[in-house]
């Protein structure tokens, strides 16, 4: 199936699924949601509203909130909080400007950040963290550290599936798919939170911009340096309307990963995935 991706009408299929997901068809919608829950083994007792009747559409269900007490955000001052629930695809050090996508598959920071060498240079030999959100997962994205939004770059692209099979077979997948690169200024330096789109994902949404829509001009750069948009660690910054992928980038020698976090391991948002190394704690 993964070999067929380049031949499929990715954007058309995604628009159709996105449209269907907004429909409010009463009992039919509830029946479909129940099938989805059963197929993926979703624990609705974690949801803020476990009753299926609370969700008038698939989109409302996909973007459901969880009970806050089930996802406490790490409290240690220097800790980095996981931005999502999901599976760690890969993580570790950036070798020069090369990141690992999967075994025998690499891509570059420059390509990931829209072919902008000046942005890429800030993360050379830094660290990266890639998490996959499966359809069953909670789809909201949260802030790993306290920070101020300075820029968002929307990069149009393909909509390949980002499931594990595709990641292992589609070259440079994350640098080819549509994505929103969100750059934050933190006490620890620059941090990138990258929201990668995928086939059948209704849309990428951020709390400051709403739905991120491709433009005819191609890459769109949104400057927020004068807006003073700040987030605390653990605050929501966006969501997907299906599963997808989130990538974190940090500059060289600024963080250390939690040794308990390893590729293929599962994570929950708010968990400790690492520690910053520049903040002086009083």
Curated annotation (Swiss-Prot):
Reactions catalysed: a 1,2-diacyl-sn-glycero-3-phospho-L-serine + H(+) = a 1,2-diacyl-sn-glycero-3-phosphoethanolamine + CO2
UniProt GO BP: phosphatidylethanolamine biosynthetic process
Metabolic or biological pathway: Phospholipid metabolism; phosphatidylethanolamine biosynthesis; phosphatidylethanolamine from CDP-diacylglycerol: step 2/2
Cofactor note text: Binds 1 pyruvoyl group covalently per subunit.
Membrane topology, as annotated: Peripheral membrane protein
Cellular location(s): Cell membrane
Site (Cleavage (non-hydrolytic)): 243-244
Residues at the active site: 85 (charge relay system), 142 (charge relay system), 244 (charge relay system), 244 (schiff-base intermediate with substrate)
Pfam family, any one: PS_Dcarbxylase
Residue positions where Pyruvic acid (Ser) is found in the record: 244
Signal peptide annotation: none
EC number in record: 4.1.1.65
Protein modification: Is synthesized initially as an inactive proenzyme. Formation of the active enzyme involves a self-maturation process in which the active site pyruvoyl group is generated from an internal serine residue via an autocatalytic post-translational modification. Two non-identical subunits are generated from the proenzyme in this reaction, and the pyruvate is formed at the N-terminus of the alpha chain, which is derived from the carboxyl end of the proenzyme.
Function recorded in the entry: Catalyzes the formation of phosphatidylethanolamine (PtdEtn) from phosphatidylserine (PtdSer).
Family note: Belongs to the phosphatidylserine decarboxylase family. PSD-B subfamily. Prokaryotic type I sub-subfamily.
Protein name as it appears in the record: Phosphatidylserine decarboxylase proenzyme
Source organism: Coxiella burnetii (strain RSA 493 / Nine Mile phase I)
Lineage start: Bacteria, Pseudomonadati, Pseudomonadota, Gammaproteobacteria, Legionellales
């Amino acid at each position: 199936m993964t070999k067929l991706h380049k031949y499929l009408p990715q954007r058309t299929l995604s628009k159709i699924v996105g449209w269907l997901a907004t429909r409010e068809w009463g009992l039919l919608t509830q029946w479909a949601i129940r099938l989805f829950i059963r197929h993926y083994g979703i624990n609705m007792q974690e949801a803020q509203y476990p009753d299926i009747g609370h969700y008038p559409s698939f989109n409302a269900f996909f973007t459901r909130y969880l009970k806050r007490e089930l996802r406490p955000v790490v409290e240690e001052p220097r800790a980095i909080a996981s931005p999502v629930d999901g599976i760690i695809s890969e993580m570790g050090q950036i070798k020069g400007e090369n990141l690992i996508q999967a075994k025998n598959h690499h891509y570059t920071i420059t390509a990931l950040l829209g072919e902008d060498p000046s942005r890429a240079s800030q993360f050379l030999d830094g660290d990266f963290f890639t998490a996959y959100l499966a359809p069953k997962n909670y789809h909201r994205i949260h802030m790993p550290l306290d920070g101020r939004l300075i820029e968002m770059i929307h990069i149009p692209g393909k909509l390949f599936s980002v499931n594990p099979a595709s990641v292992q077979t589609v070259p440079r997948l994350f640098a080819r798919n549509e994505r929103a690169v969100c750059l934050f200024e933190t006490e620890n330096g620059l941090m990138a939170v990258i929201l990668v789109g995928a086939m059948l994902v209704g849309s990428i949404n951020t709390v400051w911009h709403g739905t991120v829509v491709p433009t005819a001009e191609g890459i769109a750069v949104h400057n927020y340096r004068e807006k003073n948009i700040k987030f605390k660690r653990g605050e929501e910054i966006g969501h997907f309307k299906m599963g997808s992928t989130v990538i974190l980038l940090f500059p060289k020698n600024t963080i250390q990963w939690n040794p308990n976090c390893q590729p293929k391991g599962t994570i929950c948002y708010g968990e400790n995935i690492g520690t910053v190394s520049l903040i002086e704690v009083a």
